[in-house]
Regions:
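Metal-dependent phosphohydrolase cores
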Residues: 1-171
Length: 171
C-alpha cells in the first residue's frame, strides 16, 4: 500500500486481525481491503474540503464495513459501530460508522458522518470501475475466483450449493 497522509491516522488499526483479513473478503467483487483503503483516501480528501475532523473521518472509513456480514444491508453499520466501540474507538467514529448506509440506514448527525456517507458511495463507484477495468484483461475474474476460495463466507456458500447440487443430480 502506498503511503498517503491519511494512513498516519490509522496506523494502529492496520494490524488488527479483522482489518488484515479483509484482504481475503469479497466486497463489490473486489477485496474488501481495497474498498476500505479507497474509502480512507476519499474520507481524507473530503474531510479537508468540508472542514471535518480528519482523524474521525479516516478511522470511521477504515472500520465502516468490518464484520458487515454479521448484519444486513441496512443493519451492518450498527454491527460495525458496535465492534469499533468494543475496540475503544471514539463515539464520533462509531456514530459515523452507524449511519454510513444513509438513506438505507439512520441519517448522519455530524459533518464527519456525512463525509463517510459520501466517501463510501464514491469508493463504491471506484470499486465498480476497478472490477470493470479488470474484466478487460481477466484480472477481475481471476481475483473473484481467488476471493471465493479465501473468503470464509463464500467458501461456505459454495459448499452448500455444491451439496444441494450433488443431492439433486448425483444418485
Amino acid at each position: 500500500m502506498e503511503h498517503h497522509a491519511a494512513f498516519d491516522y490509522i496506523r494502529d488499526l492496520l494490524t488488527l486481525p479483522e482489518v488484515v483479513e479483509t484482504r481475503h473478503h469479497m466486497h463489490h467483487s473486489i477485496p474488501k481491503h481495497d474498498h476500505l483503503t479507497r474509502s480512507v483516501r476519499m474520507s481524507y480528501h473530503l474531510s479537508r474540503l468540508l472542514h471535518a475532523d480528519i482523524r474521525t473521518c479516516v478511522r470511521a472509513a477504515l472500520l465502516h464495513d468490518i464484520n458487515s456480514r454479521a448484519g444486513t444491508l441496512t443493519t451492518h453499520g450498527r454491527v460495525a459501530a458496535r465492534w469499533a466501540a468494543a475496540q475503544g474507538e471514539d463515539p464520533a467514529v462509531c456514530a459515523a460508522i452507524e449511519s454510513h448506509m444513509y438513506p438505507l440506514g439512520p441519517a448522519p448527525a455530524s459533518r464527519e458522518a456525512w463525509v463517510l456517507v459520501l466517501a463510501d458511495k464514491a469508493a463504491s463507484l471506484g470499486d465498480i470501475k476497478q472490477f470493470l477495468t479488470g474484466l478487460i484483461d481477466g484480472r477481475s475474474l481471476e481475483e473473484r475466483r481467488r476471493l471465493k476460495e479465501t473468503d470464509p463466507y463464500y467458501r461456505q456458500r459454495s459448499q452448500r450449493r455444491f451439496r444441494r447440487w450433488r443431492a439433486k443430480y448425483v444418485p
